[in-house]
Amino acid sequence: FTVAGLKQLAASERFDPRTGNAVFPGRFPVGRSPFQVPTLEEELQLVQGLNKSRGRDAGVYPEIKEPVWHRKQGQDISRIVLDVLARYGYRTKADKVYVQCFDFEEVKRIRGELGYQGRLVQLLADGPQFESATDHAFLRTRAGLGEIAKVADGIGPPLGLVVTGKTGGALQVTDLVRDAHALGLQVHPYTFRADALPAWAGSFDELLRAFLVEVGVDGIF
């Protein structure tokens, strides 16, 4: 693919390709406006421009997607992303940036071979990932978290790996956050959606309160 080719595509909220119906019908209408697919550089320009005009200091949190697949296409996606971030001043832990990735070998490479000095998050999955040999079941263990702590600053688990439900009104919480915090890792669970709540949460406020107050995670996605 080329940037010019991708720019011909229209970006929209998620929809079911079989029916054309929006997956989340309460969000921005599908097909209402012909938004283009932005590049990472354009997104960084937007964030920094809005920071200037609004007097804010919002950071960025990009994800390295499928590094193994990209290498098979002859592209080092991690090096490319880190180079773009560096051009815009995102280099160290003093800068407002987190880089995240599901592939543990790539997370280690980002910190070691590529020499990235900023904040780094190992994403966790509750199932296999496309073209990744990462053993996510192991990474969720204390031993696995210990390996993560050698190279990363935090973990990003799905909600269900932190809270499994409620029994008699009490949250059923796994040991993941406790174990991660004991190793100095931050925990940023994903994905918080007001229109796709876990079965145990009666409202978005309840979901936020459970994770931020009762469980004590460090951030949300």
Report residues per predicted region:
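C-terminal soluble interaction/assembly domains
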Residues: 162-217, 221
